[in-house]
Amino acid sequence: MLRLEDLPGTREEPIFVKAETPGEVVFTGKSQFGFSGQYVVVTGLVFRDMYGLMDAVEFRAGTKSIAHHCRLTECVFEQANKLPDNQKTRWLSVHGEEHRVDSRYFAGKANEGATVVVWVTEKPGKHQLDHNHFGPRPELGTNGGETIRIGTSDVSELDSRTVVNDNFFQECDGETEVISNKSCGNTYRNNVFERCAGTLTLRHGHRCLVDGNVFLGEGKADTGGVRIVGRKHRVINNYFEKLQGDSSRAAIALSSGIPNSPLNGYVPVVDALVVHNTVINCEQSLRRRG
């Protein structure tokens, strides 16, 4: 376990935590890495076959030592071998405010737990996840196989205002929610989803924007598009082609919901804007369902 606490970087002079030779510093097994402070850049590290701990990498060095205005870039997270147990593990937990996670590769996660989790508190995090490659993730067979989750149902009425843009999602088949949105005010823009057996799911929360994304099913079973639950979402300028999912995995699926739904239920779709989307050769273009 490596924890770096309260690193005092500044915007003008950030602190760098980096491999002397990129790609040759490898964390593996029951390793854990956490850091806190501000204006810290972590780069060039490899995290391989991580298991046995709930969070492999965290933007914090303890529950009361949280990072702010930091960046994780040019790192690799991968599972290359079968793990000795199937204990739930999240590869990356993003705590704090205004972090950037970019230019990284994630692939092969086969155990339970989201690949990346953004935690939501009373103060909007305003994070950015951009230019990452999320490679193949095999089907888990149960919940807990999201590639990205932003928030949880109990805080889903709070704003995160996280931006997820210009990422490549490739065969992310962990579960039906490739991205699980569970907070308010987030933006998903210019991402490409290729052969992913699931959807970008606005599961909880309101006022999110899904703009300019590309969903390519290539005829693969269960490939889906955008699933909408909640109020005042905007789904605009997206492209859907050869998706084979139906019902909740249709190209665009809107939930009828439950009146007076609890936070962990299904809030009806209200005041959604769904315009200027292109749907080509999909099994089911638009579905309104309970």
Can you say where each PLM-predicted feature lies in the sequence?
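Beta-solenoid repeat scaffold
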Residues: M1-V26, F33-G44, H68-C70
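Glycine- and acidic/polar-rich repeat regions and solenoidal domains
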Residues: L2-E5, G29-S36, R48-C70, E74-G290
